[in-house]
C-alpha cells in the first residue's frame, strides 16, 4: 500500500499544552509557521533546527511561556512588547560574528508590530538583518483586554472603540504593515492567512530561504476578541479572503509595480493583463464575513458604515493595482 508523505513535517516546535484560548487562530498560524521554517532550514542549511526565535510580549508569548513551563521546542527569547525586531537583530549579528549558520524568526502581534514596535521593525529591515519577522494579526491588543490597534478594521468593536450613539466603533482604516515593510526595499514581504494554510506554509518557507530581511503579515482569527464561534476560525479567515477583506499578496525586492496576487477563490473572477492580476470580481459580499462576528454586529443597523468599509476595501485593492468589484448582498 502506498504511503502518502505528509504535506508538512511532523516535527513540533510549538508544542501542545500551551494556554491559548480554544479556537485560537494565532496558535494555528505559529504551529504551521514554525514547521515551515524548520523545513526551510533543513533545505537551506541541512539542519531543521538551525533557527531561534525572538518573541515580543503578547498573546502568543503569554500562553506559551508561563514559568516554569514552555511550549517552545527551539531556542527562544522573550523580549519587551516593542522590541522583538531589535532583539532579533542582535541575535542575528551575534550568529554572524560566531559563524553560526541559520536564521532568526521574530514574532509579534499587531499591537507589538504595527504600533509600538514599528520603529524597531523599520530599523531591522533598513539595516538588512537576516531575520524573518512574522506578525500575527488578530486586529487588536487581545492579550491586554481587546483594545484597538492601528490594525483594527474600520467599524470593529473593541473596548477602546465601542460603538454607540455617536460612534460606529473603530473609525480609522486598517494599517497594512506588509506594504510598509515592502517600502524598505527588502527581499520579501507578504500577507498570509490561516484561511489558506498551504499558501501560508509556502510563503514562510520562501521568506526563510531569502538572504536578508523578510516580513509576513498573517491574518489570525480570535474567537475571544471577535466574538465568534470557536469552531469557525479557519472558515471565517477563509471568508475574509473570499470576500476581499484580506488580500493575499507578495512583493519581492520592493517591486510594488509587480505585486503577486493569490486568487481569492470563493467563486471570484480574476482578470489578468500581462500575467498580472488587474481586476477581481468577488462573488461573496463582505457581509458574509462580517455576520459571524460579534464585533461587527452593530454595523448591520448602520448600512452606511458597511458601505464605508466596502469603499475602504476597494481603495486598499487599488493600492495593490487591482480593481476590486465588491458585491452587495442584494446583487
UniProtKB/Swiss-Prot annotation:
Keywords: 4Fe-4S, Iron, Iron-sulfur, Metal-binding, Oxidoreductase
Keyword Oxidoreductase: yes
Signal peptide: none
Pfam families assigned: TPP_enzyme_C
GO molecular function annotation: 4 iron, 4 sulfur cluster binding; metal ion binding; pyruvate synthase activity; thiamine pyrophosphate binding
EC nos: 1.2.7.1
Keyword Nucleotide-binding recorded: no
Gene3D superfamilies: 3.40.50.970
Residues annotated to bind [4Fe-4S] cluster: 21, 24, 59, 222
Cofactor(s) the protein needs: [4Fe-4S] cluster
Top class in the EC scheme: oxidoreductase
The record's free-text note on cofactor binding: Binds 1 [4Fe-4S] cluster per subunit.
Catalytic activity line of the entry: 2 oxidized [2Fe-2S]-[ferredoxin] + pyruvate + CoA = 2 reduced [2Fe-2S]-[ferredoxin] + acetyl-CoA + CO2 + H(+)
Protein name according to UniProt: Pyruvate synthase subunit PorB
Amino acid at each position: 500500500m502506498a504511503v502518502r508523505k505528509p504535506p508538512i513535517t511532523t516535527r513540533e516546535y510549538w508544542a501542545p499544552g500551551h494556554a491559548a484560548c480554544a479556537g485560537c487562530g494565532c496558535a494555528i498560524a505559529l504551529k504551521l509557521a514554525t514547521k515551515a521554517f524548520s523545513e526551510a532550514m533543513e533545505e537551506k542549511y541541512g539542519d531543521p533546527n538551525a533557527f531561534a526565535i525572538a518573541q515580543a510580549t503578547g498573546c502568543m508569548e503569554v500562553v506559551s511561556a508561563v514559568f516554569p513551563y514552555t511550549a517552545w521546542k527551539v531556542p527562544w527569547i522573550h523580549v519587551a512588547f516593542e522590541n522583538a525586531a531589535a532583539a532579533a537583530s542582535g541575535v542575528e549579528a551575534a550568529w554572524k560574528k560566531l559563524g553560526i549558520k541559520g536564521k532568526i524568526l521574530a514574532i509579534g502581534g499587531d499591537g507589538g508590530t504595527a504600533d509600538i514596535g514599528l520603529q524597531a521593525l523599520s530599523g531591522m529591515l533598513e539595516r538588512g538583518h537576516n531575520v524573518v519577522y512574522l506578525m500575527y494579526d488578530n486586529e487588536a491588543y487581545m492579550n491586554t483586554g481587546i483594545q484597538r490597534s492601528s490594525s483594527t478594521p474600520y467599524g470593529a468593536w473593541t473596548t477602546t472603540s465601542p460603538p454607540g450613539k455617536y460612534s460606529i466603533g473603530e473609525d480609522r482604516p486598517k494599517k497594512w504593515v506588509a506594504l510598509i515593510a515592502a517600502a524598505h526595499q527588502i527581499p520579501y514581504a507578504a500577507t498570509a492567512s490561516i484561511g489558506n494554510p498551504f499558501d501560508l506554509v509556502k510563503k514562510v518557507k520562501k521568506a526563510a530561504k531569502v538572504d536578508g530581511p523578510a516580513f509576513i503579515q498573517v491574518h489570525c482569527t480570535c474567537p475571544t476578541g471577535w466574538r465568534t464561534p470557536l469552531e469557525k476560525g479557519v472558515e471565517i479567515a477563509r471568508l475574509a479572503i473570499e470576500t476581499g477583506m484580506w488580500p493575499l499578496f507578495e512583493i519581492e525586492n520592493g517591486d510594488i509595480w509587480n505585486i503577486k496576487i493569490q486568487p481569492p477563490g470563493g467563486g471570484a473572477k480574476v482578470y489578468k493583463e500581462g500575467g498580472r492580476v488587474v481586476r477581481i470580481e468577488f462573488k461573496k459580499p463582505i457581509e458574509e464575513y462580517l455576520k459571524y462576528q460579534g464585533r461587527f454586529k452593530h454595523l448591520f443597523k448602520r448600512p452606511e458604515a458597511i458601505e464605508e468599509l466596502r469603499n475602504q476595501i476597494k481603495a486598499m485593492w487599488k493600492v495593490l493595482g487591482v480593481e476590486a468589484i465588491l458585491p452587495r448582498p442584494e446583487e
